[in-house]
Amino acid sequence: MKDSIRSKLETLAERQQELTALLAEPEIASAQKKFRELSQEYAQLEPVIGCFRDFEQAQSVLNESKALLQDQDPELRVLAQEEIAAAEKKLERLDRELHTLLLPSDPNDKRNIFLEIRAGTGGDEAALFASDLLRMYLRYAEQRGWRTEIMGDSPGEHGGHKEIIVRIVGAGAYSRLKFESGGHRVQRVPQTESQGRIHTSACTVAIMPEAEEIDDIDINPADLRVDTFRASGAGGQHVNKTDSAIRITHLASGIVVECQDERSQHKNRARAMSLLRTKLKSEEEAKLVAEETATRRSLIGSGDRSERIRTYNFPQGRVTDHRINLTLYKLDEILQGNLDAIIDPLVAEHQADQLAALSD
């Protein structure tokens, strides 16, 4: 094992010990959101640290067995050689497991998704191909036990879909389909083609993780400047005699809120904080919408035939994924929703790239 990998694992083991101590603290246990976050982090570390402990134990057995090779007892030396072979085999397996466990996880992998299919180059034929792709993804979702819901549909003039959006709900939806984003090209003879010529059309697919609802906003008191001032307007004589009004400036965002409706400074502060939370939450939600829009634009491209990740060639019964140079002569099976034959190699290639980066 490389020193850099061992160092990373030792750091993670220390972090797990820190989490164990934190989760035992009463103030953490009473803060539900923080407790949940730390518990999730602990659960993510557990399989990694468990595997690392097994690796260390196997390494210890290997070292002890090698020491026994110097023993004068020949039977003990034979036994030591057997234990060395077993320990080396186990270490090799655990090393592979650790590398896989250390791969950076995509925080969106567990999310539900929105699938968008948009007809690109090819007019009516592209709209019909969009319908074929939709059927393929719906059948794949059905095979995996996912729930689907049509969110929006713009039908083609002569059948198919100009654009259609589907919400897919189920475990691993994003992790399995995230590599489907891009241009999908079809080569076939349209039904309206009397000369039997092959036409090329294209659709774009975008896979977008569904945004989670924003939890209650956490506000750092250090980010606040609180000013008091004498209230004006309605409220009787009392409002003009004390500095009961509150103005709160959120330094990080520049948002300013104030409240002078109540006679009590405490109540005005509570109302102002409530308004600040609402404004910050609204700002976060607007930011999420903007990010989703940007993601969608980056994924769907222009719909031009040149921006392609995959080609479906009907005359040859062929599907080619150009990113990994994978060609399968299983067009009918794939269009029936048997997508694992393409998705599994894509996932494997992605993991191989991550492992290569991890080993650098």
UniProtKB/Swiss-Prot annotation:
Keywords: Cytoplasm, Methylation, Protein biosynthesis. Methylated by PrmC. Methylation increases the termination efficiency of RF1. InterPro entries: PCRF, Pep_chain_release_fac_I, Pep_chain_release_fac_I_sf, Prokaryotic/Mito_RF, RF-1. Gene3D superfamilies: 3.30.160.20, 3.30.70.1660, 6.10.140.1950. SMART domains: PCRF. GO terms for molecular function: translation release factor activity, codon specific. The modification N5-methylglutamine is found at residue 237. GO terms for cellular component: cytoplasm. It comes from the Bacteria. The keyword Protein biosynthesis applies. Pfam families: PCRF, RF-1. The keyword Transcription regulation does not apply. SUPFAM superfamilies: Release factor. It is found in: Cytoplasm. HAMAP family: Rel_fac_1. Peptide chain release factor 1 directs the termination of translation in response to the peptide chain termination codons UAG and UAA. This is Peptide chain release factor 1.
